[in-house]
C-alpha cells in the first residue's frame, strides 16, 4: 500500500478515513468521522480494498472487515499505515520449498496460531 496521507488531505481527513475503516471492521469509532471518511475512502481506497472493505487478496490488499490486523488495528496503527504505507507481500516460496516442506510449514503456522489442522 502506498502512503496516502497527502492524497487524503490533512491529518483530520486521515483521521476521518481511519474511523471509516474502524466502522467497516465493526470496531469502536466516531460515527461522524466515519461518515466523513467514507467519501475519502471511496476516492483513495476502494480500488484496492473495495467499497465493502473486503480487499482484493490477489493484489495483497487487506480485508479491513475481519479481525486480522497485520500492522495493528488501533487508531494509531491504522493512521500509520495510511500515512506511511506498507510493503508487506510475502514472496513465493515454491522454488525452494518442496510440497512436503510446505505442508510441514503450514501445519506449524496453523499450530502456533491456534487454528487447528490444515
Predicted features along the sequence, with ranges:
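Sequence/structural segment immediately N-terminal to covalent heme-attachment motifs in c-type
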Residues: 29-55, 66, 79-84, 117-118
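Extracytoplasmic electron-transfer domains, predominantly the class I c-type cytochrome c fold
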Residues: 1-24, 56-114
